[in-house]
Amino acid sequence: MQHPTTRRSFVNAGSLGFLGLSLRNALAAEAASKLPAPGKAKSVILFWLEGGPSHIDTWDPKTNSNFKPISTNVPGIHVSELLPTIAKRMDKFALVRSMHTRGTDHPQATHYAITGHEINPAMQFPSLGSIITKEMGPRNAVPPHVLVPKWDRSRQYEEYFRAAFLGGDYDPMCIPDPAKPGFQVTDLSLPKSVSQAAVESRSAFLKAVDRRYRELNDTADHTNMDAFTAQAWKMILTPAVRDAFDLSKESDKMKERYGKDSIGQSCLLARRLVEAGSRFVTAAGYHGTSWDTHSDNDKGHRDRLAPPLDRTLTALVDDLEERGLLESTLVIAMGEFGRTPIINANLGRDHWPNCWSLALSGGGIKTGQVIGVSDERGANVVDRVVTMGDLYATIYQALGIDWKKEYMSPIGRPVKIANSLDDKTGSPVKELLA
């Protein structure tokens, strides 16, 4: 027996309020974006190492580290003994050991790393992910910009990942920790008031959506919003989209491969999302176990921090390669800064933006190499300084985005999308571009 969806039952479903603004805004981007000239990369996964790893204890081993350097499968390149699995796959990575950025505390440095700009009380700046989402547009019906997991406590950092004056269309969809029991993306869940019969009768259901919203005021804004909301329903009713967020589709072996903690499951979900069509996914599983080792640096890196990085980053890159996705997916593993070459009184290392390291893989990047040189203690860059603007320009170039582009802000100020030190425009690191 069929139970057709009436206008009344649709209204009782909550007028689509349960969808959440993030889902509707993601869909709205489809109407506002134009695809750029294609590059090798189609998506980005930012493996966010929150808190700032010690570069001299990971990517750029020095004599003032208590951890030994080990050889990799690329002659001449060494990494810390804390990264043995990565060492066996160094041919799949490029290391930048000469990052030089701004911000000596976490809010300043995180804002700078995520937006490319220093904090300015007069205006907010769009994040890297939001710019990429705007410039490239969505693929399929999947949210193009996702942050996983969202911050459960402080929301300050989460704001830095948003689109600012570009508008909510390009904000990330912020979802819960996928490693927690009962993980579910509520924006993709039907309300109890919508019957299964209505879901099974998709055509009639979507017609009911259209009828409901045609009754609204016939303004341009309403018309656009109605279309996006109807698309949101289509997204909910599309199995491929729902499946992208469904980690139960993954085998237990695959979950173990990535790690069943927040770090591993966030990266596994990121892979599922870019596979389905997302443009930019931030895997921020280090929320709860930050790299901010002001005390017991060695113990923290050895026991809590480096092992998940070594396990999960290699699992992600290997998995992408096995699925034929690595060339089209740029993977970036970085935090907001490095850590001091000198150990403090609490056996920790403090913040150090002057010289630090990050790792890249996939996306057409030329791997198996090191860019830049730091001094013997990892305190200063001695060759090939790379600024945040240079990194951004490199990412944009890999994606086929014009890295010289500027946006006009609401206060009439041009904003560079690849902003470098002293308000200069960054330049792509040509050695990284294959």
Please give the residue ranges for each predicted region.
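Ligand-binding pockets and gating/stacking loops
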Residues: 1-434
